[in-house]
Amino acid sequence: MKKLLASCAAMAMALTLTGCGSSGSGDREFEGQELHLYNWGEYMGENLIADFEEQTGAKVVVDYFDSNEQMYIKVANGEAYDVLVPSDYMIERLIQEDLLQPLDKSKLSNLDLLSEDVMGLEYDPENEYSIPYFWGTVGIVYDKNKVSEEDLQAEGYNIFLDTKYKGDIYLYDSERDSFMMALKALGYSMNTSDADEIQAAYEWLLDMNNTMNPTYVTDEVIDGMANGNKDIAIVYSGDATYVQSENEDMSYWMPKEGTNLWYDAMVVPKNAQNPLLAQEFINYTLTYEAALGNSEYVGYSSPNEEVMLELSGEEGMYGAYEAYIPRSGYEKDEVFQDNPILKKKIAELWIKVKASKG
């Protein structure tokens, strides 16, 4: 589950993954070439790299990052990769700073396999620079035996102010996710730059922090909820899918106030050393076989429409888990934008929120 478990995988050294069973023949188009991939940890199917190497004759060298910001620093400082897998708002920033090269759509024959829901988004409306890799939502995982669905329906994010759940909640140790929750609870855009709205969200978080005794976690939320240690938590959809698969008492709720609808996508940096091989890799990941292996292993929603429908069907691996299918078309859901003013302000305020907890 990328969004949290990546922090563990990123501690490892860069890995070189070489396919097994290659005949070593020289008739493959990219025989002997190298692809340098920079991705989140725990974010690829187990056979994705080996199968691509077998098919192309190339060798894939993978580095892992645990945040978009960590990735950005290396790319902005000139470190060369062929493929990156950043999130929506970071793609917007990379485009604005002219750090990406346009894709050659003639090399991407599998684009028609993708769901319309993942294409033509605001950060790259023509998909000139990015091709979707995974997508999902942020929502509430809760114990159906202990948390009332009526409370969730009536209160939405304000359930985190409901004192009957005091001491039984997990929250991400993340200013971005926490302020998203607070801003949405108050009816504001999570992309606001309005000082009064940001201040109101800060005060909401202070109130929650001082009355609800939340437990702030990172990857611990996954096993914690799977083990039933708390009753309610803010969780990314792929992690929620895992929690539900491990504990049948857990369910997933997307509040009526709206949430973060997020997208991670593949891009080619401007200084890529092998852009042709990069686009071959991107096109390969869109195939049914590659997309199926990715989504089965990671648990996040595939951009490949056939894969998503198969895995979410009655007989599918994730058919019983509502977290697997993102809510699309809901007007109050938003994609994070690159907003330096908001980012700087909430980082400062988050330190104060955490310091206020007794």
Language-model-derived ranges and their functions:
Residues 15-19:
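C-terminal motif of bacterial Sec signal peptides marking the signal peptidase cleavage site
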Residues 326-358:
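Conserved C-terminal helix/tail region of periplasmic/extracytoplasmic solute-binding proteins
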Residues 38, 80-226:
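Extracytoplasmic ligand-binding site segments that recognize negatively charged/polar headgroups
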Residues 264, 269-330:
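Mature extracytoplasmic/periplasmic domains
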Residues 90-93, 226-227, 232-249:
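A ligand-binding cleft/hinge motif common to bilobed small-molecule-binding domains
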Residues 26-97:
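Early extracytoplasmic/lumenal segment of secretory-pathway proteins
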Residues 199-207, 246-270:
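Periplasmic-binding protein-like
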Residues 21-23:
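Bacterial signal peptide processing site
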